Amino acid sequence: MDSSEKELIANLKSDGNREKAFKILVKTYQVRLYWHIRKIVMNHDDADDILQNVYIKVWKNVDSFREDSSLFTWLFRIATNESLSYLQQQRRHSVVSMNEISEYLVESLESDVYFEGDEIQKKLQLAIIQLPEKQRIVFNMKYFDEMKYEEMSEILKTSVGALKASFHFAVKKVEEFLKEEPK
């Protein structure tokens, strides 16, 4: 943790500088957090809502942040947990199978006016959607966010070995999907 991050945390925890520090936090991490969430839930509006929930949790709980990890890691852990909670809540409220959830994610991707990828990018996203939830998150964090396994381990509370295995299997499944998909 560098000195500017320590200063930001101190300001977030002090009443006098809290709002200004919070604006800096939002400006610094908003884009990365949004895209991390978006890759999990696949929908712009849902990602925006979840991001707001993340900020509310951070605002309410910053005083309990123990600084065992970096601020970035703590924020990503909250964003990941909020995203997974959202998906679990969606599953509970609607009695649907995993296939139906995958179909919903595919439909969301195909009808998303904010998706700007070409056909190759779309095929990759379709392949990623087919992955089990945990593998999808690990793949996105490693491939797109270029996170180190140690960082991912802190965020996901999973061993480095398990993350490497998840990523390996995810890559194999994505490769298979891309080979099978018509060009």
Stretches with model-predicted labels:
Residues 138-142:
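A short pre-motif secondary-structure segment
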Residues 1-32, 183:
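N-terminal module of bacterial RNA polymerase sigma factors
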Residues 64-66, 77-97:
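Arg/Lys-rich amphipathic alpha helix in sigma70-family domain 2
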Residues 26-44, 61, 128, 173, ...:
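Amphipathic, Lys/Arg- and hydrophobic-enriched alpha-helical face
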Residues 2-7, 93-117:
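Internal acidic/polar
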Residues 73, 124, 135, 150, ...:
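DNA-recognition helix of helix-turn-helix
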Residues 35, 49-56, 69-81:
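Structural recognition of an alpha-helix C-terminal capping motif at a helix-to-coil junction
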Residues 14, 42, 55-70, 90:
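Sigma70-family region 2
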